[in-house]
């Protein structure tokens, strides 16, 4: 039995070693006939960059060898006004969901897909005038360089992650659960609400002219810096809120668990 297992492992290593080797040279594929959408759903092992623009456009950037081998490397479709994006698990070399290795015409196939050793991750660039709802789940990763919107919602779950450089919005609401994470360099908003549960986490620099509301439960944690006219927090379970770098003009901290968490210091004064 041990001998058979060892033989199988050796065959597997040999098969993967004989797969096509990507050169690192990037190529691009544009998804055709993309219908208008106002919501974005990211799943699977998918890296997505949202670029706000005048047109609706989806383009896939990956190693050229990978694009040549796998015609349908990215699945992009609009359902009920929502763009659903998923990518075949190539960033991890298929090893994370390994089921079978096949040989066809001298090529190696893992889980029925041509195996290519990649050096760079697959990235999907999404362009749209305005998206008001983002869903990031599984191992999905969303990056927002800059966006301007009236009302927007973000749902980050499982091991999903959201990274943003600058957001300008009237009202924004974040739902972070599972092992989801949020990292926002600059958030300018009238009202901002954060719901963080399970082991979700957040790191946010905010400029809030209205109310900043934070609801943390389970083992969730979030850290704020910047300014807010009003700050309201509700903390339960082992959740924690750190706002040692948050300046708030309202001297009354509302909500349950009013006492500051360990290491937390609210600085009160006029918000510039």
What are these regions (language model features)?
Residues 151, 160-196, 200:
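Histidine/lysine/aspartate-rich catalytic loop segments that bind and position anionic ligands
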Residues 18-137, 143-155, 168-175, 190-192, ...:
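Acidic (Asp/Glu) and glycine-rich low-complexity loops/linkers
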Residues 4-13:
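Sec-dependent N-terminal signal peptides
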Residues 29-30, 124, 142-143, 162, ...:
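Short, flexible, glycine/charge-rich loop motifs used to bind or transfer phosphoryl groups or to couple energy/partner
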Residues 182-272:
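Short, surface-exposed interaction patches in beta-rich subdomains
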Residues 15, 19-21, 142, 158, ...:
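Compositionally biased regions
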């Amino acid at each position: 039995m041990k001998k058979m297992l060892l033989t199988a492992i050796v065959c597997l290593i040999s098969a993967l070693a004989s797969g096509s080797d990507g050169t690192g040279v990037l190529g691009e594929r544009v998804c055709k006939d993309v219908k208008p959408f106002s919501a974005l759903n990211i799943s699977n092992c998918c890296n997505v960059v949202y670029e706000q623009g005048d047109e609706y456009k989806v383009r896939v950037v990956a190693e050229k060898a990978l694009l040549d081998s796998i015609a349908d490397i990215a699945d992009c479709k609009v359902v009920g006004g929502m763009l659903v994006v998923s990518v075949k698990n190539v960033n991890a070399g298929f090893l994370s969901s390994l089921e079978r290795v096949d040989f066809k015409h001298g090529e190696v196939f893992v889980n029925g897909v041509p195996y290519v050793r990649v050096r760079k991750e697959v990235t999907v660039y999404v362009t749209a005038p305005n998206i008001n709802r983002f869903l990031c789940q599984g191992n999905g990763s969303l990056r927002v360089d800059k966006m301007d919107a009236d009302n927007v919602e973000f749902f980050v779950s499982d091991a999903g992650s959201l990274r943003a450089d600058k957001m300008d919005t009237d009202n924004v609401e974040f739902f972070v659960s599972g092992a989801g994470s949020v990292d926002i360099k600059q958030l300018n908003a009238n009202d901002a609400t954060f719901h963080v549960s399970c082991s979700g986490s957040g790191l946010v620099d905010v400029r809030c002219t209205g109310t900043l509301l934070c609801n943390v439960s389970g083992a969730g944690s979030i850290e704020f810096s910047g300014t807010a006219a009003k700050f309201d927090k509700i903390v339960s379970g082992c959740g924690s809120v750190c706002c040692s770098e948050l300046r708030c003009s309202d001297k009354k901290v509302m909500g349950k668990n009013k006492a500051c968490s360990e290491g937390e210091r609210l600085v009160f004064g006029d918000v510039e």
